[in-house]
Amino acid sequence: MSTDNKQSLPAITLAAIGVVYGDIGTSPLYTLRECLSGQFGFGVERDAVFGFLSLIFWLLIFVVSIKYLTFVMRADNAGEGGILTLMSLAGRNTSARTTSMLVIMGLIGGSFFYGEVVITPAISVMSAIEGLEIVAPQLDTWIVPLSIIVLTLLFMIQKHGTAMVGKLFAPIMLTWFLILAGLGLRSIIANPEVLHALNPMWAVHFFLEYKTVSFIALGAVVLSITGVEALYADMGHFGKFPIRLAWFTVVLPSLTLNYFGQGALLLKNPEAIKNPFFLLAPDWALIPLLIIAALATVIASQAVISGVFSLTRQAVRLGYLSPMRIIHTSEMESGQIYIPFVNWMLYVAVVIVIVSFEHSSNLAAAYGIAVTGTMVLTSILSTTVARQNWHWNKYFVALILIAFLCVDIPLFTANLDKLLSGGWLPLSLGTVMFIVMTTWKSERFRLLRRMHEHGNSLEAMIASLEKSPPVRVPGTAVYMSRAINVIPFALMHNLKHNKVLHERVILLTLRTEDAPYVHNVRRVQIEQLSLTFWRVVASYGWRETPNVEEVFHRCGLEGLSCRMMETSFFMSHESLILGKRPWYLRLRGKLYLLLQRNALRAPDQFEIPPNRVIELGTQVEI
């Protein structure tokens, strides 16, 4: 989205507030409460309050303002961001071994996101609904059911798209941030002493005074920056400048005022630690605050769900996940998609998490490991891009990496303390996703290599067919080919069993480029291989969905006319059997067979009319 038009800049910035900052913007609901709840062995003491506030503020400055907004967002692929984009950029100018390591890092980062995304909707909505405990303590037993009801409605509306609802996101989130600022400023005015915590020496003093406990407490401080990856991942939707402008003009001031306002309240009334956010508000404002907090957390959850859809589509297009049904919910915006399988799997996981953990404080113990792990990987990948792609001085890049890791590694290490109390959850989910992605990619490669290892030359076969043609039948046949120089299995089996060939034969290859979009001018490449054979290569970006009808429309514009309803599409359908393998590779093979059986069929994947498809089966041992 361009920001060149100055008149549109305020609207784009407002939209960025509504989508990008939902997660990090709802962190004040629970962050300071978890920091000072007594779990680390100290209560609401002046030095502890000042120390935590100083840590939170300077984390927002260093991690969000400097690392992500200033440095990481420089690394874009045609304006797009995200951990898989960073992985792709980092591996462009490196050796094969280094590229493999970077790919593994990127996949781990993507897997971590899947692990955390189960927790974000649960902890966000529950922390808002828990405001009921302040309004009416007798309703505390309704927190879990109400949280499930709210999230059920949210997941149910996904299939209708969020375009209409999304128009409300920005004004609601802007109102939310203004409320954060207003509540915090009101409390700070009553106790301005709290502003001393802006001095970073209070963070240093905190470590010196509380020693080992202060290090472990970093696991709670990191809650203030959860959602920071969204800034980079959503860069393609809004552009760098609007995201930066929204942060420095609205989000950062509002968060700072609210955190320090909560600190001022706790210095004055330590008993407010049971829920310092809601106790900032006067009694008459509690119910309206509860309502807008619930709306803000729903918006934060929506942003995460949309992020999962986008990451899944990117992983599918790059070949790391099996093809699945992707529905476009907007004719105008290609980024608005709905993936039913992912939506309902995520819903089931979120409900299980809510029922199992019962309170947002329990979920806070599960939060942070995957976030900080992704931060470490982002530091390594982004500095690799700076060195290999931007050709920055290696010593300067090394200093940047050391500075980032000096913050990231302590945060990650501190969160490892949460492993047994809930941190195992995102790690387990992330591990499962990593195994699934690497299994699909490696076994798919093994299958393709197995299918084509004994293949003949395509050029030689075409020359032979033109010289001694079989029976020719009227019409056009399209054979889907995974590689441009390989004879499609369906073509070989059609000749073997039916012993006929159509008057025109098109070998069609759909490939994904290392870019989010491919310009229509470069969409289709046509090459005539002989009098009756053509090769068509259609290129798509990883944010685009291939459409065969569109491909042949482009072919018609370039002189190769082809009517969809008068064309036969031949595809091979592999029946896979496992060969002899070690037990661990056999398990991986069985997982691949399960994924293959449930993958979206090629005709549905490429939107080919079912009555024009002929599938020819073949058995392959892998």
Curated annotation (Swiss-Prot):
So what does this thing catalyse? K(+)(in) + H(+)(in) = K(+)(out) + H(+)(out)
Task: Give the domain of life.
Answer: Bacteria
Gene Ontology MF, one: symporter activity
How does the entry describe its membrane topology?
Multi-pass membrane protein
The UniProt transmembrane annotation reads 9-29, 49-69, 103-123, 137-157, 165-185, 213-233, 247-267, 276-296, 337-357, 363-383, 396-416, 419-439
* GO CC, alphabetical: plasma membrane
Annotated localization: Cell inner membrane
InterPro entries reported in the protein's UniProt record: K+_transporter, K_trans_C, K_trans_N, Kup
**Endpoints of the signal sequence:** none
Keywords on record: Cell inner membrane, Cell membrane, Ion transport, Membrane, Potassium, Potassium transport, Symport, Transmembrane, Transmembrane helix, Transport
Instruction: List, alphabetically, the NCBIfam families matched.
Output: kup, PRK10745.1
Q: What is the similarity comment for this entry? A: Belongs to the HAK/KUP transporter (TC 2.A.72) family.
* Function description: Responsible for the low-affinity transport of potassium into the cell. Likely operates as a K(+):H(+) symporter.
Query: What name has this protein been given in UniProt?
Result: Low affinity potassium transport system protein Kup
The encoding gene is: kup
